[in-house]
Amino acid sequence: MNKIKNGWLSQIRKVISPHFDERPDVEDISLLVIHYISLPPEQFGGGYVDDFFQGKLDPTIHPYFEEIYQFRVSAHCLIERDGKVTQYVSFNDRAWHAGLSCFEGRDKCNDFAIGIELEGSNEQPFTAEQYQVLAALTRDIMQAYPKITLDRIVGHCDISPGRKIDPGQYFEWERYLALVKKGLDKK
């Protein structure tokens, strides 16, 4: 179990993103949004997600980077293919991950959501390590933010339909939720 103190996970890598601001109400954190990211598309590793979330992406490295390097986005955490977690923004702050979004009639999901990126794509399955780590991280988040319940865990596609497709066709919701529940039963 990873302790969360003042919105930060203990014992994991931190790379601070400047792309965040204060939440309107920390007590309102009540949604977990699952995303995927790969930079360049369909490629893993390389540290480009760190650069992107810090506003330091070099547009000369890859043609796709020319399109996105000026975007100001972040997520709270990234889970890499090997299960390594990096935190970019305190859970108590508003990361800029959801964009135009709506959940149960409420707009601006960044105001009340935590965003977790999985290193991945819509073209291949996620790893066993990612499912294990995501489930454990989810349980830690649920313990620290009890308004996040199993029915308030969604994909980016669910809050931005027609605009986003992540976590994509290969994300195994049943597998992930079973792992989350299995760990909750032990507590």
Regions found by a protein language model. Give the residues of each.
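N-terminal catalytic cores of peptidoglycan-degrading enzymes
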Residues: 1-107
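Residues immediately flanking
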Residues: 36, 118, 157
